[in-house]
């Protein structure tokens, strides 16, 4: 009985060691998506990027459920934000200690295209892409963002919009909250052998948490419409050609102001708006046309060309000064 026990133990030990070795040799690699609209494409690419980079994945965005870009970016190291309107409509973002006002010292992009109204001349971001319709957010800092825009000391943020799906899919989400806050998000798309499309609409509105003494609200309304169309050749062993056209329209109507409160009024009623700012009103309109040609020879070699045209209109009527 003792001999049998001793002879069985080495066999059992060898079998367990072999299983452990097999488990150690199996490594699951993160999926890498080749896209002309993304800088990183995955957390794996972000970890292996020269310099500092961070990738907020679609799964993370879905789990967060935020419409405010400020909240999304709080998990990213080296990013500082300060609130202005409480909804992230005009965020103030600082990367690595740069000036945060209007995010004017960072490079802001959507799908790899400069999104600020005048990124080289007047980069103050009075327009910021709606975070609620994004599927990913990419942040690159330091040396890793030199190639993307005029600001090389801070970093760049690339907002990745909803991609054309590989098969038919449709999504409808609606939510409501306090202060008559409503959000409706709809998108649908499909891809065939040589053609694909995606249409998306976002409506976001609220009466706001501030109010006048006459109970008039200080809220906003936003509309955002995006359409994408893509044609491509068959994926053979040779070069693969594709062309994608993206058309977008966005507008905003808000009762926003620069006027604050005195210290005593803030301590008594922090959400009060002075009647002098009752006529303050902001309207914006943004359109975009983006054409992307991609010539892909392999997973390591591709040629990308972007053609884009953006327009931005802004009228902000606001109280300038009060004399008494």
Regions found by a protein language model. Give the residues of each.
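N-terminal periplasmic "start-of-domain" segments of outer-membrane beta-barrel proteins
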Residues: 31-64, 89-92, 106
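Outer-membrane beta-barrel pore domains and translocons
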Residues: 37, 142, 160, 173-179, ...
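Non-catalytic regulatory/gating segments with a bias toward low-complexity or hydrophobic composition
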Residues: 61, 73, 137-138, 157-159, ...
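Extracytoplasmic beta-strand/coil segments of soluble accessory domains associated
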Residues: 70-117
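Short acidic/polar hinge/loop motifs at secondary-structure boundaries
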Residues: 113-141
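Transmembrane beta-barrel wall of Gram-negative outer-membrane proteins
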Residues: 176-205, 213-257, 281-298
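Flexible, surface-exposed loop regions and adjacent strand-edge segments
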Residues: 215-221, 256-270, 320-324
